[in-house]
């Protein structure tokens, strides 16, 4: 049971790991918590483990590096493989791939540490409008996000995001509903609509606040739910996901769906969305954990 790790999302991973470990032990699995920060994962196989439930979040656990190590030692593991994990950690390249497949994403401008000096806020606002969303390409859990409401705020928002990553996305603001859709073994589960207390679903709303509201079913018409499920499955297949993943989707002001990002190791805490979605189709937390484990390759 891989949990903890070295990324900014270490604590979230511990919370997920605790819940999953409990569920596995309750069902008679011989499961042990392993924190890669404290233990050399290359020794897992020779220490007698025969599969890994990977609930690490963020860099070093969800970005293809851990997956590659587990492939090297020949240990089956849960979730996406090396390529899908590495690709989806990079929001910019994920969106470029989706765009190439003809799938809908927000309009964006990419800024790097090297190109920051040439950033022309006026030109960006002329192209994308206001407000804008500024975010690091690689950080998960909504770390480093800023909503920019005026052209003068853009540079400082990008500077702030550059503390977390070298590549920054400046995106058109999507004013419609925020949705997240879980996929389990190629089955698209019911969408969840997220209504944060603040202006957007940030770290506080995700992990701390009890005032964020979640609606599942999401209140979409059957036709819209079907349209969303088809879109999400195409997005999941395009990046090569397997086992389980959660895809975030926003609506623009006109209600058009826009793909946002993929979570290849979704959270599994009491606040988490994947278990909420599974529960609406009669899959208990314990059943979900076992199903994810059974899908490990």
From Swiss-Prot:
Superkingdom of source: Bacteria
What's a BP term from Gene Ontology annotated to this protein?
Answer: peptidoglycan biosynthetic process
Cofactor binding: number and manner: Binds 2 magnesium or manganese ions per subunit.
InterPro entries given for it?
ATP-grasp, ATP_grasp_subdomain_1, D-Ala_lig_Van_CS, D_ala_D_ala, Dala_Dala_lig_C, Dala_Dala_lig_N, PreATP-grasp_dom_sf
- Identify the pathway: Cell wall biogenesis; peptidoglycan biosynthesis
Which E.C. number(s) belong to this protein? 6.3.2.4
Subcellular localization, per the record? Cytoplasm
| GO terms assigned for molecular function | ATP binding; D-alanine-D-alanine ligase activity; metal ion binding
Class of this enzyme = ligase
- Kindly give the Pfam families that the UniProt entry links to this protein: Dala_Dala_lig_C, Dala_Dala_lig_N
Reaction catalysed by this enzyme? 2 D-alanine + ATP = D-alanyl-D-alanine + ADP + phosphate + H(+)
What this chain does, per the entry, is described as:
Cell wall formation.
NCBIfam families, A to Z = D_ala_D_alaTIGR (TIGR01205), PRK01372.1 (NF002378)
Q: Which family does it belong to?
A: Belongs to the D-alanine--D-alanine ligase family.
What is the name of this protein? D-alanine--D-alanine ligase
Say which species the protein is native to.
Answer: Haemophilus influenzae (strain PittEE)
